[in-house]
A protein has these predicted regions:
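Structural/interface elements that position substrates and couple domains in central-metabolism enzymes
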Residues: 1-313
Length: 313
């Protein structure tokens, strides 16, 4: 089944560029978002987020009739869910937006459709999404029920783009494709190859989910090492910048530069998804989060102390 109409649910900093990328390849794309202002803005050929080069692509796509936005899902050949996945309580992942998105598209699902979850999610989220869909559509079959013969194909395909470079990295970067079956993976790869110049690397859904969490946890741990060094060096009266410069002269050492914590949204959130599911095993990942979460407070305390010394003088 070819992909004539593609629906992207969630028109934020990942969803809208993804919708625009498909539309730029002359696919009919329907973006869905609960934010009426975002929908109205997009339908005027404008954008409600800041991202270089995105505005021109959206404007052209809307003017040529390949992109429109709505607040309610409609019939499509493929659905991509790109909604927020924050954490709640004691840093447990909150899947309420994914659940709402899945249940909103369930009534318009048809045989042969492909549903892809792009939102950063805990391991097992794709299977849970498939369960929600199956509960609402008992007239259709799903991969967890009949495997490769399912009426609806489901996959997890996380984004890995840098804000400010999204329109380049969305197309150039390799993509991890985690289908619930090999058929699901093949169809998801076919979909992304509409605009992708990078490689589709195929695995299963659970590994793909863990891959995205691992990428950001790896970065978080490395940042935490540099930040912890800065705390130690401050206590020991050592210049941390000189220390790192010297240590990095070792051919197999590449320590990052310390800072006031971590930037962006993902790195400060995603590692907690691993910790929440594996509290006994993820001790290093938890500690890295605690180090980086505490660094801004340490910086503030240092600034206060410096200001106090100046005022005292």
């Amino acid at each position: 089944m070819s992909f004539t109409t593609i629906s992207v649910i969630g028109l934020g900093y990942i969803g809208l560029p993804t919708a625009a990328a498909f539309a730029s390849r002359q696919k009919h794309v329907i973006g869905v978002d609960v934010n009426q202002h975002a929908v109205d803005t997009i339908n005027r050929g404008e954008i409600h987020i800041v991202e270089p080069d995105l505005g021109a692509v959206v404007k052209t796509a809307v003017e040529n009739g390949f992109l429109r936005a709505t607040t309610t899902p409609v019939d499509a050949d493929a659905y991509l869910i790109a909604v927020p996945t924050p954490f709640k309580g004691e840093h447990e992942p909150d899947m309420v937006y994914v659940e709402a998105a899945a249940k909103s598209l369930a009534p318009v699902l048809k045989k042969g459709a492909l549903v892809i979850l792009e939102s950063t999610s805990p391991v097992g989220a794709t299977e849970q999404m498939a369960t929600w869909l199956a509960e609402m559509r008992p007239d259709l079959t799903f991969p967890q029920q009949v495997g490769e013969h399912a009426d609806v194909n489901i996959a997890y395909c996380p984004e890995r783009v840098l804000p400010g470079q999204v329109m380049v990295e969305l197309i150039k970067n390799d993509r991890v494709i985690g289908g619930m079956t090999s058929v699901c993976s093949a169809r998801a790869s076919e979909l992304y190859n509409i605009f992708l110049e990078g490689e589709c690397v195929v695995t299963n859904a659970r590994t793909a989910e863990m891959c995205k969490l691992t990428e950001n946890s790896f970065r978080d741990v490395n940042i935490a090492f540099a930040n912890e060094l800065s705390l130690i060096c401050a206590d020991q009266g050592i210049n941390v910048w000189e220390l790192i410069r010297l240590a990095n002269r070792h051919p197999r050492v590449n320590i990052l530069q310390p800072g006031p914590g971590v930037g962006g949204h993902c790195i400060a959130v995603d590692p907690w998804f691993i910790v929440a599911q594996n509290p006994q095993q993820a001790k290093l990942i938890r500690t890295a989060r605690e180090v980086n979460d505490g660094k801004p407070h340490w910086v503030v305390d240092r600034v206060k102390a410096a200001v106090a010394d100046c005022l005292a003088d």
